Amino acid sequence: MNAVIKLCRADKEFSFLDNAEVKTFFNDKTSGTIELAKQLLHKHDFLQAGFNIDEGWYDCSQVNYVLKARGRSLGGHAVNICGYDSDGFYILNQWGTGFGSKGYAVMPYDLFLKQFMYGAYLTNLKY
């Protein structure tokens, strides 16, 4: 499978989002959700998804940047989806560069379906 990576930078100026319109694209937990997210990632620059995260998110580091489920639920949190490959989605977390690999992590598809709450894409972006 080919990897697809979009531009997502933790240090990017987000003024281009000022007039953006949010479009919800899914809120179910099926394998079709994964395929829909991949299709939309090809068409749009900016995807966000909300997850019911757990303690395993705090284990994500430079050495271990693949998310794993662990412990109790900590509530909802949104991240940017930047790409995917055969291992899962590449995400950018806004917790800073101390999270995962300089702010990035891989979210395996099974964990995506387990913790997924909603997804959205933005239109009318002015760069």
Where do the protein language model's features map onto the residues?
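Predominantly the structural core of cysteine protease catalytic domains
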Residues: M1-L92, T97-Y127
